[in-house]
Amino acid sequence: VFGENLGFAWTDDGFFLLAEEDCSVLFIDYEHIVKRCPKACAHHSTVVSNLVKLMSEKTQALSEHLEILSRRTTREKLTAYFSMLAAKNKSLYFTLPFSQTSLADYICVDRSAMVRELKRMSDEGMIEIERRNVKLIRLPAEK
């Protein structure tokens, strides 16, 4: 699902999307979302509820990503991201949801510099990491 936030924006700005494979796009008019159908069917309420939930989840994910990217150093970005994953998993053990290359892209750092920082963090006893499996041992206190 994409572009759901554009339906509620009061602008005529365009939207560009490049699909990796053939696909269909369903356009839903803003008026069909905000106005109830004459029968007030349950399907309409479900669509609206799902759309609001989806927008909320995307907003939360973007907020978390922005929180990570706002950190200055690679270590601070990794620490923030690992702390979020630990909190979501309610465990100091978790599996990274993607490869180290994708992690470096996600936190906007050079992959080799990130790998060196992970090694330093491991050597300092902050984390244990094997492939995508991470165990938090201790993290620096927030400044």
Language-model segment annotations:
Residues 36-44, 62, 85-91:
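Basic, amphipathic alpha-helical hairpins
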Residues 22, 30, 71, 75, ...:
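ATP/adenylate-binding site constellation spanning eukaryotic-like Ser/Thr protein kinases
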Residues 61-85:
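Short alpha-helical segments that sit at the start of domains
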Residues 43-67:
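Long, low-complexity, charged/polar intrinsically disordered regions in eukaryotic proteins
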Residues 1-52:
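Cyclic-nucleotide recognition modules
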Residues 77, 83-143:
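Phosphate-/nucleic-acid-contacting segments
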Residues 31, 49, 53, 57, ...:
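Internal, well-ordered alpha-helical scaffold/interface segments
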